[in-house]
């Protein structure tokens, strides 16, 4: 509190938009949902009863999932190791974690399409990076399912989440113990609207929902303006 350090979270408008769409589809407010925003920046949110209760990003947009150029979760002692043993400055370490890590650091590419293309050609670094990316997402799915004591749906959104059937399949593989069963045929889509890509037998719905952050921002502004008008009218009545 003294230094104004807190958990901020990021991609909030995206998570809010798709979670509300998911709740509307499920038809119940008291739901347990994990929203997975996968783009060049990536984040996940655990949403219980319509409220965010945990998020992979915090004070900065660096931690959590492996991203295009950002590291995601690391052992914090690496920072001190780089500074003490290799004389990295704080600015150099910050640049390394923000701009030269993640998929770029693992493969030399920051664009998932390039990484997938290289993996298909047999590039071992790219194959490993795709496995690592899915593994990290799975860890958070398991963690969030535990803290919410169950799961009703997981939602994929943003550039990669909406447009990469391969990444969705990698993430959902071997999660049947949680009740997550992906339909391989349904998953071969890049939808322009809410689409269910899980099987009928899947207890947990797997949804792909195109995000619309601009619309969510407009809705928030209109809501804020309505509240201001209500307050103004109440004051005028006084």
What is each of the regions a protein language model found here?
Residues 9, 13, 17, 42, ...:
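Conserved active-site and cofactor/substrate-binding residues in soluble primary-metabolism enzymes
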Residues 1-83:
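Glycine-rich phosphate-binding loop of actin/hexokinase-like ATP-binding domains
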Residues 48, 54-86, 95, 158-189:
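Catalytic phosphate/nucleotide-handling subdomain of diverse soluble enzymes
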Residues 86-129:
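A mobile "lid/hinge" subdomain adjacent to the ATP/sugar-phosphate binding pocket shared
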Residues 17-25, 78-82, 92-96, 143, ...:
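Alpha-helical scaffold segments in soluble metabolic enzymes
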Residues 127, 131-151, 161-230:
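Internal helix-turn-beta structural module
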